[in-house]
């Protein structure tokens, strides 16, 4: 999953099975860092993600489940992350400002085989408790409610 340029929609019952050729489950940008309104953004991305599961390849692979950068904000509810070196990697000053303003949060999450739950590379001062609550309460996507008849390749 990849968002940018002020995306503010909702994602529900998201199931991501990580593959060898990918290094992240989600990469969320507030604006496109190559083009766009990045010199003085008017809008930041601020999606709401509910019932999310990301299965990685194991914490020894040094991959990130979720990277938030370039000023994105995001609200996560009911998350299950498994098999990553980093659960959340937050980058860039504007992303940190979103955390300090209460515009980025994670509620009800379970971390399995995650080495570091939150990495703060924003320059802003905050800790895990300022972003994440309800550790151990996340069950993730309701996979069984929609997977009947689907096949995996």
Residue ranges and their predicted role:
Residues 2-153:
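Extracellular beta-rich repeat passengers
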């Amino acid at each position: 999953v990849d968002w940018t340029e002020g995306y503010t929609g909702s994602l529900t019952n998201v199931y991501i099975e990580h593959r060898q050729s990918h290094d992240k489950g989600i990469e969320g940008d507030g604006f496109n860092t190559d083009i766009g309104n990045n010199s003085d953004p008017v809008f930041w991305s601020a999606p709401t993600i509910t019932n999310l599961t990301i299965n990685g390849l194991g914490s020894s692979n040094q991959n990130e489940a979720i990277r938030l950068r370039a000023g994105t904000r995001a609200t996560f509810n009911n998350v299950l992350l498994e098999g990553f070196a980093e659960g959340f990697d937050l980058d860039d000053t504007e992303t940190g400002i979103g955390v300090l303003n209460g515009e980025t949060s994670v509620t009800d999450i379970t971390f399995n085989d995650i080495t570091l739950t939150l990495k703060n590379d924003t320059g802003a001062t905050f800790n895990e408790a300022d972003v994440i609550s309800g550790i151990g309460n996340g069950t993730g996507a309701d996979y069984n409610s929609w997977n009947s008849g689907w096949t995996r390749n």
